[in-house]
């Protein structure tokens, strides 16, 4: 009986992995279906010129869909942005904060609000893309075959539907597959661009544009970067939590101590992604006017990768969102109240406000280190790419996302296997009894 249960659990895990792979294949197929009314030759010419610009990272996150102007050109970024905005608003806006406390029903309502906001943001971005495409002209002719109202409407509908389809695929992976669907969609997009980035680097080395020593140094640097990211992502500060002793009859229960782990990088990869979104926003607004305007030229120059203004704003925004998102993920006051409710306490700290202040003190120190770690990981590759013209697929943000997704997915698989073995063990015990 135990063997049958173990076999059933193993088959369930395999089916979940197969389902996840199938959904990701659909995402990749969609990234090669172009939106209607585009001259592919002219578009390729434009994409080659802008592969190292500020739009390069978003092309990387979309798995090349933005460069090919496919139905998934906006990727799942509008949904991520909408979710983050709703989370930020839930801190400042009381009705949303109350919804979070309503449990499963409140969670469903918040998810629905995120979807509505996704449609709004995707529509805004899609219209900006349509206007940008209409303004693009190359030596072979305009990118848009027949510009006008019909093209704009078609583009907006196509891109919004593509984003909503990706959102749905991500939700299906989360519910019926393995790992976080949204993260895996971004992950597969980044991974798809790695082979071409490696080929491009070795091609530059072969032609003499990049010395073999630098190419080898980059490869060693990549391995070290991955090791550093794994170290910092796994780093924790463990706080001792003591539970009081309780006497029930002649027996004494409790009194044991446990540890509360606080991650060094509590905010995850959200700060660099959202910081990049903020830096892209002025450029998106400029596209509504004229792409050849002085404003657009200034924005393109000052917000170019590796430029001092871009680097400074990038670091400031990463630090800001590190603190802001950590405050959302970990509520010190709520955690302190929960500990007091169960009679637990931090040794040397009084329950309640004293404990809450202690959490804030620890988190502030951790977040400073975590924010600096994120800034260094994201900024150093930016400077190197600007100097040696290496593809954005090898950027710091992409490494952060890939390593985090792999670690999270592996943890979920291990948790699933452990819970399956635990359930099998419990069934065996019940059968013996």
Swiss-Prot record:
Protein origin, superkingdom: Bacteria
Q: Where are the transmembrane segments?
A: 17-37, 71-91, 117-137, 141-161, 184-204, 212-232, 268-288, 310-330, 366-386, 388-408
Look up and give the membrane topology term: Multi-pass membrane protein
* Keyword Cell division set for record: no
**Protein keywords:** Cell inner membrane, Cell membrane, Membrane, Protein transport, Translocation, Transmembrane, Transmembrane helix, Transport
Q: Give GO BP annotations, semicolon-separated.
A: intracellular protein transmembrane transport; protein targeting; protein transport by the Sec complex
User: By its UniProt entry, which Pfam families does this protein fall under?
Assistant: SecY (PF00344)
As recorded in UniProt, coiled-coil segments are none
Q: What is its main location?
A: membrane
Gene3D superfamilies tied to this protein:
SecY subunit domain (1.10.3370.10)
Q: InterPro entries given for it? A: SecY, SecY/SEC61-alpha, SecY_CS, SecY_dom_sf
A GO cellular component annotation in the UniProt record: plasma membrane
Subcellular localization(s) per the UniProt record: Cell inner membrane
The record's subunit annotation is:
Component of the Sec protein translocase complex. Heterotrimer consisting of SecY, SecE and SecG subunits. The heterotrimers can form oligomers, although 1 heterotrimer is thought to be able to translocate proteins. Interacts with the ribosome. Interacts with SecDF, and other proteins may be involved. Interacts with SecA.
What's this chain's function? The central subunit of the protein translocation channel SecYEG. Consists of two halves formed by TMs 1-5 and 6-10. These two domains form a lateral gate at the front which open onto the bilayer between TMs 2 and 7, and are clamped together by SecE at the back. The channel is closed by both a pore ring composed of hydrophobic SecY resides and a short helix (helix 2A) on the extracellular side of the membrane which forms a plug. The plug probably moves laterally to allow the channel to open. The ring and the pore may move independently.
Q: Record's family?
A: Belongs to the SecY/SEC61-alpha family.
Query: What name is this protein filed under?
Result: Protein translocase subunit SecY
């Amino acid at each position: 009986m135990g063997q049958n249960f173990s076999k059933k659990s193993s088959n369930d895990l395999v089916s979940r992995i197969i389902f996840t792979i199938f959904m990701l294949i659909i995402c990749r197929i969609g990234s090669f279906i172009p939106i209607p009314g585009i001259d592919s030759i002219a578009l390729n010419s434009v994409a080659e010129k802008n592969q190292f610009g500020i739009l390069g990272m978003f092309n990387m996150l979309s798995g090349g869909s933005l460069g090919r102007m496919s139905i998934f050109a906006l990727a799942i970024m509008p949904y991520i942005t909408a979710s983050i905005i709703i989370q930020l608003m839930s801190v400042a806006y009381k009705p949303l904060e109350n919804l979070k406390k309503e449990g499963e029903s409140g969670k469903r309502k918040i998810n629905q609000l995120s979807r509505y906001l996704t449609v709004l943001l995707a529509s805004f971005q899609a219209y900006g893309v349509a206007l940008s495409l209409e303004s693009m002209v190359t030596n072979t002719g305009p990118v848009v075959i027949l510009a006008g109202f019909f093209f704009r409407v078609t583009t907006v509908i196509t891109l919004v539907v593509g984003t909503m389809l990706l959102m749905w695929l991500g939700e299906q992976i989360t519910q019926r597959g393995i790992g976080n669907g949204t993260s895996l969609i971004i992950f597969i997009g980044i991974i798809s661009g790695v082979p071409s980035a490696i080929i491009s680097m070795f091609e530059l080395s072969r032609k003499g544009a990049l010395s073999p020593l630098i190419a080898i140094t980059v490869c060693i640097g990549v391995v070290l970067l991955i090791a550093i990211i794994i170290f910092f992502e796994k780093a924790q500060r463990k706080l001792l939590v003591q539970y009081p002793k309780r006497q029930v009859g002649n027996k004494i229960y409790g009194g044991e101590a446990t540890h509360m782990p606080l991650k060094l990088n509590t905010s995850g990869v959200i700060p660099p992604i959202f910081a990049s979104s903020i830096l892209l926003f002025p450029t998106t607004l400029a596209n509504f006017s004229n792409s050849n305007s002085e404003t657009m030229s200034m924005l393109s120059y000052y917000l170019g990768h590796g430029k001092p203004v871009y680097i400074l704003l990038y670091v400031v925004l990463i630090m800001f969102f590190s603190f802001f998102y950590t405050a959302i993920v970990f509520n010190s006051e709520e955690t302190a109240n929960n500990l007091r409710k169960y009679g637990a306490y931090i040794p040397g700290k009084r329950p309640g406000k004293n404990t809450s202040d202690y959490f804030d003190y620890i988190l502030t120190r951790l977040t400073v280190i975590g924010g600096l770690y994120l800034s260094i990981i994201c900024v150093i590759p930016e400077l190197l790419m600007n100097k040696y013209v290496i593809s954005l697929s090898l950027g710091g943000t992409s490494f952060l996302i890939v390593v985090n997704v792999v670690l999270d997915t592996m943890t979920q698989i291990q948790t699933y296997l452990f819970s399956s073995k635990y359930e099998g063990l419990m069934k065996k015990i019940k059968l013996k009894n």
